[in-house]
């Protein structure tokens, strides 16, 4: 298991109350493959540095998890297929 941090920028037209339940469906991919979700931090609506898909704002979510590389790539693939996800960034957070 490796530690990862995933930043997800969601469509700002979403209701912020529905963000956590909709993310749970994606995070179940990690749990099903034996990984663990350490922390889900919903930052809320923030201004983007530049427009993405004609949106000047986005709902930021940061997820800390431990999983296998194949599981994380599958999670990233599923997030990118979702229309409400504007952008994702996956980083390995090895602590040296």
UniProtKB/Swiss-Prot annotation:
Gene from which the chain derives: rpsF
GO molecular function, one term: structural constituent of ribosome
UniProt keyword annotations, A-Z: Ribonucleoprotein, Ribosomal protein, RNA-binding, rRNA-binding
Family annotation (HAMAP family): Ribosomal_bS6
Family from the record: Belongs to the bacterial ribosomal protein bS6 family.
Keyword RNA-binding set for record: yes
Function, as annotated: Binds together with bS18 to 16S ribosomal RNA.
This protein's name: Small ribosomal subunit protein bS6
Pfam family, one: Ribosomal_S6
Gene Ontology biological process terms, A to Z: translation
A single GO cellular-component term on record: cytoplasm
Keyword Ribosomal protein carried by entry: yes
